[in-house]
Amino acid sequence: MERRGLAGSVTALIFAAFLFGILAPPVAAGGYDNALNGVKQVQAVFDMSQGSPAVSNAIFWAVKNVYEDATVRGLSAPPQVAIVFHGPAVRLISSDRSGFKKEDYAEIDKFQNTIRHMKKDGVKLEVCDYALKVMGVDPATILPEIDHVGNGFISVIGYQAQGYAVVRVP
């Protein structure tokens, strides 16, 4: 008798779990149910001026996560991400390491590898030629994965006019 009671309890628990699974409201993955309510696609342009290699690596982990996130990828249209480099950030995407300490080189290499992977992932990458001039960076030293634009602010404005959200990375 006790054996049938245990089997009945297990069956009841399985049935309850099944029923709860069907009747429970869906939970948005990642907890973005408010932020992404009604959103069909994530479009973001990152306005990048941060010049610290270590800080930039930490930030770019999060930037990469924006378009790799399962919830974002689950929207009806794939994410579109652009990054516009200007200010001190232009030094991070250059093969010229002058002005950096040797202990920064590994962080710069890591950052540049992240940029290469982002390009392969379809991220649009642009550098402001005006910023290169102001920062004294030779345009020929910029990673080949990055497109040159005359004025990065015009690019940011253009992306915003196309519906991209602007995210400043000071």
Placement of each model-derived feature along the sequence:
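N-terminal secretory signal peptides that target proteins for export/translocation
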Residues: 1-7
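Secreted/extracellular ectodomain signature
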Residues: 27-170
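Bacterial N-terminal signal peptides
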Residues: 11-22
